[in-house]
Structure formats: structure tokens, C-alpha cells
Amino acid sequence: MVALLAEHTDTRQQAGLLVRPDNHDALSVAVTATPVVTTTGTPATPPALELDVQQGDGIGKRAGLPSRKQIETWVTSALYADAALTVRFVDEEEGRALNRSYRGKDYATNVLTFAYAESEDDPVTGDIVLCCPVVETEAREQRKPLEAHYAHLIVHGVLHAQGYEHEDDAEAEEMEAIETETLQALGFEDPYRDDHTPVAH
């Protein structure tokens, strides 16, 4: 297999030509486009982000909610393509109702991600819903700063919105490695250092 890289008309992408044997007397050729990344694996040019931050009933009164600037920083750190995302903070009642309706689980979970892109060619669009009481309880039980736990779950949700999953061990290891690298680059500790944070998808 031979892979050649070249400049792309979009400065955030690099064009590629992939040539590999198909049969004994044939070759398959594919043209690709991938984000230009730095040595740390993050895009060299930050993707464009359309961000909507929402709060459910009574959420504005809760202490420890991240600011819009923090949310935007955390979301962007985990993006590999332009995206339109909503980050919504909800109470236990709304979180439970969403989890019951869409996953068939009658309890509130820490984070839910609703990804709307139907193929890899579609723009990254999705909703990331965080249940504040659950996040606060987990941070306290795991002895983590609340800010760090919110950052972790938002990064986790952003990865889900881009198609990452943790259905098997290999997928889980990949996601955890990306999350750890991203959070450490943001100045947080490894979220999996002592505990495996339970996350929903």
C-alpha cells in the first residue's frame, strides 16, 4: 500500500492518494481528505464551531456550572472538524426522562449525546446533555474537582458526536486515550487515573 499526501484547497485539510493492491493484477485508488494535525494529534487550525449553551429549569441557580468560555474551550479541544453543537445542562427529572425515552433506561445518567450526522460526509451536529445532580454527585464520590469532571464529560460527548464509540474494549481504549490526552493538554489530570468514570453514549 502506498499513501501520498498533498496540499488541500482547504488549509485545514490535507489531500491524500491511497494506492493498494486489489487483486493479482489490479490496484485500487482512493482520494482522501484528513485534518491537518499537530504532533499532539489536534488539528493545526481550530475547526469552526457553532455552539449553543442551554440550561434547563432551575439550573442557573446551581453552583459550579462552567462558563460559556470554558465550555467552548473544552468542546474545541476535542473537535476534528467543523461542528454545530448544543450543550445543555439539565436537572434529574429531565435527564431521567431523556434517558428513558431514548435509551430505555429509567434513571438519570451523567451525559447523553445525540449525534445527528448520518454519514462521515455530513457536518458534525449534535446535542450534549449533562445532568447536573449526577455530575456533582460523581465528582464528589470520585474526589474530583467539579470543573474537571464537567470538562471530561463534555470532551467525551464531543467525541461521541464525531462518531467515536466504546462498544468494545478496543473502542473504549481509543476513546479513553484521546480523552486523557485532551484533558491533560487542558491542564487536567488523567480522568481514568484512579476511577473509571461511568459514561453513557
Curated annotation (Swiss-Prot):
InterPro entries assigned to the protein according to its UniProt record, in alphabetical order: MetalPrtase_cat_dom_sf_prd, YbeY, YbeY_CS
Subcellular location: Cytoplasm
Cofactor note: Binds 1 zinc ion.
Keyword line: Cytoplasm, Endonuclease, Hydrolase, Metal-binding, Nuclease, Ribosome biogenesis, rRNA processing, Zinc
Cofactors named for this entry: Zn(2+)
Keyword Transmembrane found: no
GO CC entries: cytoplasm
UniProt function note: Single strand-specific metallo-endoribonuclease involved in late-stage 70S ribosome quality control and in maturation of the 3' terminus of the 16S rRNA.
Family stated for the protein in its record: Belongs to the endoribonuclease YbeY family.
Identification of the protein by name: Endoribonuclease YbeY
Source organism: Cupriavidus pinatubonensis (strain JMP 134 / LMG 1197) (Cupriavidus necator (strain JMP 134))
